[in-house]
Amino acid sequence: SYNPGGHGATPSTVLSLNQAVPGVAGTIESGSKFGTFILATDVTNDGIADILVGTPNKTVGGKQNAGIISLFPTIEGKPSLMSDQMFHVNQSAFAGSAQSSGLFGTSIATLGNDLIIGSPGRNVSGLSNAGALYYLNR
């Protein structure tokens, strides 16, 4: 339970997550905006909420602001840093490739164990910033 000032019977514990923390996938990058979007929901189907983090300004494959999302499964009530997963458009699960200013990970939703990821800056059919969403069936 959260107890920020140390008042009461339960002491507080705060864990700071970023891409400079050992075990977290990816590398820290100026301006990547890790944590722009955060969602706690059970996507690993173990009955415990996991943490999804959007980093829409992350460089992917040399494309600035392409974006990623990170999944931190929870183990014993804490985010697992050694089993986190990083998702981006250059992975084979996604059609296409990373685009500059695609902003993948600006929004995240779930439908059961599936992930729905917003990419509002995605160019589509030659139209700039037309936007797209990705449905990742897990």
Positions of the model-derived regions?
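Conserved beta-strand/short-helix segments
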Residues: 1-138
